[in-house]
Amino acid sequence: MVKLAKQIVVRGRVQGVGFRWATKMIADNLDISGTIENRSDGSVFIQAAGEPLNLAKFVAKVKAGPNPYANVSTYEEQPLEDVPNFRGFQVTG
């Protein structure tokens, strides 16, 4: 099973609106593992790993905003060369 991993930073109305927990639900449904955390600059930082098709679906949902209260104004991603060995998808901060 081939896995890809990405590091993602989203900005906009992404804190205090349930963004992390909605993203976790999406990740759990798509069998994506990784972490998500709020950053002090108001952004949200995500590391996500999974099968390519599921990871693409996850990214599309994150870009669109995982719930109706969130609004993603900027989205940045970088591939991770080494796929971390995450256990599930965790809200870490």
UniProtKB/Swiss-Prot annotation:
Belongs to the acylphosphatase family. It is an enzyme of class 3 (hydrolase). Keywords: Hydrolase. This is Acylphosphatase. It catalyses: an acyl phosphate + H2O = a carboxylate + phosphate + H(+). Its EC number is 3.6.1.7. Residues 5-93 form the Acylphosphatase-like domain. SUPFAM superfamilies: Acylphosphatase/BLUF domain-like. GO terms for molecular function: acylphosphatase activity. The gene is acyP. It comes from Lacticaseibacillus paracasei (strain ATCC 334 / BCRC 17002 / CCUG 31169 / CIP 107868 / KCTC 3260 / NRRL B-441) (Lactobacillus paracasei). It holds the Pfam family Acylphosphatase. The active site is at residues 20, 38.
